Amino acid sequence: MIGRLYGKIIEKQPPEMVIDVQGIGYEVLLPMTSFYHLPQVGEEATIFTHLVVREDAHLLFGFAQKQDRTLFRELIKTNGVGPKLALAILSAMSVVQFANAVENEELVKLTKIPGVGRKTAERLLVELKGKFKGIAQTDFFVEHSHETMVATYEIDASEEARDALLALGYKLTDAEKMIKKVHKSGATSEQLIRDALKASL
C-alpha cells in the first residue's frame, strides 16, 4: 500500500496530477477540496494516498490531509459507494461540511452531489451517523485553513473547469451551466470549480 508521496508536481489537470518521486511519475486523482491546495507545477508537495487495485487498473487517490483520506476510506466501505463517487463527494464538500450534513441528517444536501441518489444518501446517513460526533475535539476531523495557490498558467479556465466537473460525474449540459453561472474574467479553473461546486449545493 502506498500511503504517502513526497515529490515535485510535474503536471496538474483537475482532478488529476502527476507527482515525480525520485524519477517515477505517479498519476494521482484528487478531490477538488485537496486539489485547491496544491502548490504550483515545479514545486514540491506531500500528499497522503490510498491505492485502489482493480483487475484493469491500479488507481492512486491523493489527499491534502489525513482526515480527507480517513473520510474517503469510510465512504468506500459504504455499500454502493465506489472510489469515484467518494471522490465526487469529497470534491463537493469538505470533511467538516460532510460530517455536519450527516450528523444533521441533511438528505437533500447529499443528493445534490452527482451520483448520490436518495438511497445512497440514506445509506450514508445510516452507516456514518455517529462516527463524526465531537468532530471539533478530534484533530482527525478538524478543518484547517490552507493557503490557496494560484496556478501560474491558464490554458482555458472554463474548459478545464468543465472537464473537471465531467470527471467528477456531472453531465456535460449541467457542467456547462454551472461554469457559465459562476464565470468571471481572470478566474482560474480551480476558482471556477470551487464556485460551481459551492453554488450547486
Swiss-Prot record:
Q: Which residues cross the membrane?
A: none
Task: Report residue spans for region: Domain I.
Answer: 1-64
User: Where is it localised?
Assistant: Cytoplasm
Chain positions covered by the region annotation Domain III = 154-201
Enumerate the UniProt keywords alphabetically.
Answer: Cytoplasm, DNA damage, DNA recombination, DNA repair, DNA-binding
- By its UniProt entry, which CDD domains does this protein fall under? UBA_RuvA_C
A Pfam family found in this protein is RuvA_C
Please indicate which superkingdom the organism of origin belongs to: Bacteria
> Mind telling me which GO cellular component terms the entry cites?
cytoplasm; Holliday junction helicase complex; Holliday junction resolvase complex
- SUPFAM superfamilies (alphabetical): DNA helicase RuvA subunit, C-terminal domain (SSF46929), Nucleic acid-binding proteins (SSF50249), RuvA domain 2-like (SSF47781)
Task: Cite the residue spans of the region called Flexible linker.
Answer: 144-154
GO BP term, example: DNA recombination
Q: Where is this region: Domain II?
A: 65-143
Q: Which GO terms describe its molecular function?
A: ATP binding; four-way junction DNA binding; four-way junction helicase activity
What is known about its subunit structure? Homotetramer. Forms an RuvA(8)-RuvB(12)-Holliday junction (HJ) complex. HJ DNA is sandwiched between 2 RuvA tetramers; dsDNA enters through RuvA and exits via RuvB. An RuvB hexamer assembles on each DNA strand where it exits the tetramer. Each RuvB hexamer is contacted by two RuvA subunits (via domain III) on 2 adjacent RuvB subunits; this complex drives branch migration. In the full resolvosome a probable DNA-RuvA(4)-RuvB(12)-RuvC(2) complex forms which resolves the HJ.
Question: What protein family does this chain belong to?
Answer: Belongs to the RuvA family.
Please describe what this protein does: The RuvA-RuvB-RuvC complex processes Holliday junction (HJ) DNA during genetic recombination and DNA repair, while the RuvA-RuvB complex plays an important role in the rescue of blocked DNA replication forks via replication fork reversal (RFR). RuvA specifically binds to HJ cruciform DNA, conferring on it an open structure. The RuvB hexamer acts as an ATP-dependent pump, pulling dsDNA into and through the RuvAB complex. HJ branch migration allows RuvC to scan DNA until it finds its consensus sequence, where it cleaves and resolves the cruciform DNA.
Show the domain comment: Has three domains with a flexible linker between the domains II and III and assumes an 'L' shape. Domain III is highly mobile and contacts RuvB.
Q: What is this protein called?
A: Holliday junction branch migration complex subunit RuvA
| Organism in which the protein naturally occurs | Haemophilus ducreyi (strain 35000HP / ATCC 700724)
Q: What is the lineage of its organism?
A: Bacteria, Pseudomonadati, Pseudomonadota, Gammaproteobacteria, Pasteurellales
Task: Name the gene.
Answer: ruvA
